[in-house]
């Protein structure tokens, strides 16, 4: 059985930054550090940080006065931000800068009184945070997930209308929704390119190349990870058996028993140690040496807040 590795895969710059913010805060200030929502959607990462003293909460009211609070990589609404400001808290923002870019687009539209349409998945924390940047009662903020949603959407003024997208969507699905928006609302304005982030796009491109060669595709990522789900869906659309797994223990021998080639990739919030464990398990099941495919090189780095720019080793 051949093992192929998608490239790129795993951590993106936004996830690296968010995890570093929590790790550095723990090193500098000590436990406990409060984090609103899972800092990234990966069970292994969250459990590891919890063991070191991070406390994950959903409501600001759960945080005691005087505590350190970190916003997750998915971002928060202005209402949540304002609630935190009103409390005696030290706040660090781990929102991915590419999500912040979308927040700024929505805030600008709100100030101008333009109605805005967000393409995204209802209930996802990034969507809730982005929708929560709009506050102009004269305008409106709407959420659509599919071309059918676009057909049933009513707006107040088609002449002052813009759209944005969640950063972790399917590139293909989003293109279909954008086409539907432009057909329904010819004057709609959008970003020069959609807001889907470089890492999401690159990993979908990589899994497409992987699925062209593999019989079975394993995507390392948690069930609540939007970008990981999109990777598994893309491989399935290409007619391949694809499975989303948290770690190597999820692998069922029957999945790969007849496979000549198994492809492995990882969502943007999945650490490489999980991928290495998956490779080891596949080798136990008869796999050979893991062969990485060629792919786009990623050199993007997002800095942590200056207050947290320390060598963690110096404070341990």
UniProtKB/Swiss-Prot annotation:
What keywords are annotated for this sequence in UniProt? 4Fe-4S, Iron, Iron-sulfur, Isoprene biosynthesis, Metal-binding, Oxidoreductase
Assembly and interaction partners: Homodimer.
Binding locations of dimethylallyl diphosphate: 41, 74, 124, 225-227, 269
Q: Where does isopentenyl diphosphate bind?
A: 41, 74, 124, 225-227, 269
Q: Which gene encodes it?
A: ispH
Q: Which GO terms describe its biological process?
A: dimethylallyl diphosphate biosynthetic process; isopentenyl diphosphate biosynthetic process, methylerythritol 4-phosphate pathway; terpenoid biosynthetic process
What is the E.C. number? 1.17.7.4
Q: What is this protein called?
A: 4-hydroxy-3-methylbut-2-enyl diphosphate reductase
Check the record and name the InterPro entries matching this protein. LytB/IspH
- The UniProt annotation places (2E)-4-hydroxy-3-methylbut-2-enyl diphosphate binding at 41, 74, 124, 167, 225-227, 269
Q: Which GO terms describe its molecular function?
A: 4 iron, 4 sulfur cluster binding; 4-hydroxy-3-methylbut-2-enyl diphosphate reductase activity; metal ion binding
Q: What role is this protein assigned?
A: Catalyzes the conversion of 1-hydroxy-2-methyl-2-(E)-butenyl 4-diphosphate (HMBPP) into a mixture of isopentenyl diphosphate (IPP) and dimethylallyl diphosphate (DMAPP). Acts in the terminal step of the DOXP/MEP pathway for isoprenoid precursor biosynthesis.
Q: Which enzyme class?
A: oxidoreductase
Q: Per the similarity annotation, which family is this? A: Belongs to the IspH family.
- Native organism: Citrobacter koseri (strain ATCC BAA-895 / CDC 4225-83 / SGSC4696)
List the catalytic activities from the record. Answer: isopentenyl diphosphate + 2 oxidized [2Fe-2S]-[ferredoxin] + H2O = (2E)-4-hydroxy-3-methylbut-2-enyl diphosphate + 2 reduced [2Fe-2S]-[ferredoxin] + 2 H(+); dimethylallyl diphosphate + 2 oxidized [2Fe-2S]-[ferredoxin] + H2O = (2E)-4-hydroxy-3-methylbut-2-enyl diphosphate + 2 reduced [2Fe-2S]-[ferredoxin] + 2 H(+)
Q: What cofactor is needed? A: [4Fe-4S] cluster
The free-text cofactor remark is: Binds 1 [4Fe-4S] cluster per subunit.
Asked if the keyword Iron-sulfur belongs to this entry, the reply reads yes
Top-level lineage group: Bacteria
Cite the annotated pathway. Answer: Isoprenoid biosynthesis; dimethylallyl diphosphate biosynthesis; dimethylallyl diphosphate from (2E)-4-hydroxy-3-methylbutenyl diphosphate: step 1/1; Isoprenoid biosynthesis; isopentenyl diphosphate biosynthesis via DXP pathway; isopentenyl diphosphate from 1-deoxy-D-xylulose 5-phosphate: step 6/6
- Residues annotated as binding [4Fe-4S] cluster: 12, 96, 197
Pfam families membership: LYTB (PF02401)
Which residues of this protein are catalytic?
A: 126 (proton donor)
């Amino acid at each position: 059985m051949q093992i192929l590795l998608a490239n790129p895969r795993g951590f993106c710059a936004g996830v690296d930054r968010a995890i570093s913010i929590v790790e550095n805060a723990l090193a500098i200030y000590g436990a406990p550090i409060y984090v609103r929502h899972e800092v990234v959607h990966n069970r292994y990462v969250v459990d590891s940080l919890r063991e070191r003293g991070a406390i994950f909460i959903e409501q600001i009211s759960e945080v005691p006065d005087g505590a350190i609070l970190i916003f997750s990589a998915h971002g928060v609404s202005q209402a949540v931000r304002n609630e935190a400001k009103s409390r005696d808290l030290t706040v660090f923002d781990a929102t991915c800068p590419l999500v912040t870019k979308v927040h700024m687009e929505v805030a600008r539209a709100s100030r101008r009184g333009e109605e805005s349409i967000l393409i995204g998945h209802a209930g996802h924390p990034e969507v809730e945070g982005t929708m929560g940047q709009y506050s102009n009662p004269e305008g409106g903020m709407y959420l659509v997930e599919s071309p059918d949603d676009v057909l049933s959407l009513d707006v107040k003024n088609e002449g002052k209308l813009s759209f944005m997208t969640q950063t972790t969507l399917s590139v293909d699905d989003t293109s279909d929704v954008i086409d539907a928006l432009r057909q329904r609302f010819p004057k709609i304005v959008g970003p020069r390119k959609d807001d889907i982030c470089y890492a999401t796009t690159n990993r979908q491109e990589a899994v497409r190349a992987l699925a062209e060669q593999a019989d079975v595709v394993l995507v390392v990522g948690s069930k609540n990870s939007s970008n990981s789900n999109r990777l598994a869906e893309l491989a399935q659309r290409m007619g391949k058996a694809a499975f989303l797994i948290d770690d190597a223990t999820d692998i069922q021998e029957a999945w790969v028993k007849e496979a000549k080639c198994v492809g492995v990739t990882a969502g943007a919030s999945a650490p490489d140690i999980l991928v290495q464990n998956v490779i080891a398990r596949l080798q136990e099941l008869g796999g050979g040496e893991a062969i990485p495919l060629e792919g786009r090189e990623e050199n993007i780095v997002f800095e942590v807040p200056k207050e947290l720019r320390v060598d963690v080793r110096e404070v341990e």
